[in-house]
Amino acid sequence: MFTRNLKRGMSGDDVLLAKQRLVSLGYLYAATKRTFGNDTLKSVKAFQSANGLEVDGIIGRLTWAALFGEIETTTAAISIPERFTPSARQAIGIALAQVSDVRREICLDALQFAAEAENNPQAMMGFYIRGGNLYNKDLSLNVMTESKLKAYFRRSEYAPYFDGGRDDLMMENALRSMFAVPGCDCSGMIVGLMRKHGIYDAGFDANANTLGGSHTIKTTNPQSGDWACKSGHIGLYVGGGYEVEAAGGAYGIQLSKNRRIFNFLTGKVQRFSAWEYYGDPKRY
């Protein structure tokens, strides 16, 4: 049974079991130790290549299932919103099937509030609300009711985030949804998700730079649930090259790839500067 991702440098009975299976399939010469070394890495990559899997040398959920003939978790069983394009759903589904339950749950939570940039979205599923957290301290969803939105629009210090017609756009969207759309800013999305899923306590709060700089370890091999970081901004990497990010008043919460984001005011996709690094969260 799959319990964790296995990679070079790790050890344990599950590593030995995987190595023994690779031996029986002819990909590894011998399996006498419980350590995932260089020979194991090469054999895993060879197995992945031969079986149409992502060749990353990591025994994730899909690679484990292929090794042992298990189908306990498949992309079909992962509830990715049907409003996304088939290519996005497939890429994200494959990635989510290979990570831990908590990473998958965090990503699926964020995805339900995202509009896909490349799919000509008709409505925002989540608003960009400066200073807002996706989940409140009582773990309730931060739904932008009529009174909340009007109070937000009265705050002159936040005008740079909703002026120029963005307030009208958001109010129209809210009316169509019967004021059921949640709101947050970029760091508030991450903070809210961390609260909701018990990674940090309900009082946890931090800005984008603190989240990336103090709560992650930089990685060049991101997996679903890692954080996408740049100065003053943060998003959630959900796999397959996609991120969920609260991008701004004219954009709301979006599923983006290569920082291409849909502008609901202009009806066009914009390209933003690349992420500076990905961070592997220290708590999960």
Each language-model region and where it sits:
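Loop/turn positions that initiate beta-strands
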Residues: G225-D226
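N-terminal capping segments
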Residues: A65, T75-S187, V191-H197, S231, ...
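Acidic, Ser/Thr/Pro/Gly-enriched interdomain connector segments
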Residues: M1-R34, T73-I78
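Low-complexity, Gly/Ser/Thr/Pro-rich intrinsically disordered linker/tail segments
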Residues: L265-Y284
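Short, basic/aromatic beta-hairpin or loop at an interaction surface
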Residues: V191-T210, L236-G239
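Conserved hydrophobic/aromatic packing and binding residues within compact polymer-binding modules
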Residues: V44-Q48
